[in-house]
Amino acid sequence: MIRLEKAGREDLAALVQLQEMVRARLLPEGQPLPETAGDSLEDFFAHGVVLRALMEDDTMVGAVGGREVDGRQHLAQLLVHPQWQGQYVETMLLLQMESLLPEARRELLFPARDAADLRPLLWLGDTVSEETPLPHGLALYRLEKSSI
């Protein structure tokens, strides 16, 4: 059973470790995950909220950061442990974030290898509004969802 709760700054080391696992799955050694200005975990702790997904033994298997920007919900740093990807952890995190930041519009930046990685987001009603090619066969997708 997975439970969701707000993360605190004391979780930063575990979040960075989770971020590294996701990065290692997507990119060659030493290459950072793409992020835009203001989208670091520290930024979300300072100006928004970070949710974490925990197993019964308190192992962190997922996280997402969100905040309100110009009247819309802005999400980034959607991180799910590689062994738990595609098992609805992403969906649970996004649905919970919707309840915490109930805005009429959501924007999510999401790095992925291909559009198949976007399935959980598309299932929730997000649409791809922009796709930016990145090195190493990745793309940064900007997804939006109206009427949350």
Which functions belong to the PLM regions below?
Residues 17-32:
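Helix-loop element at the rim of GNAT/NAT acetyltransferase active sites that forms part
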Residues 28-51:
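Active-site rim helix/loop that mediates acceptor-substrate recognition in acyltransferases
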Residues 113-131, 135-136:
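Conserved active-site alpha-helix within GNAT-family acetyltransferase domains
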Residues 101-113:
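Conserved GNAT acetyl-CoA-binding A-motif
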Residues 2-17:
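A short beta-loop-alpha structural element at the N-terminal edge
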Residues 59-67, 72-79:
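Conserved beta-strand in the GNAT
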Residues 48-64:
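Conserved beta-hairpin
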Residues 80, 86-99, 123:
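Conserved acetyl-CoA-binding loop-helix of GNAT-fold acetyltransferases
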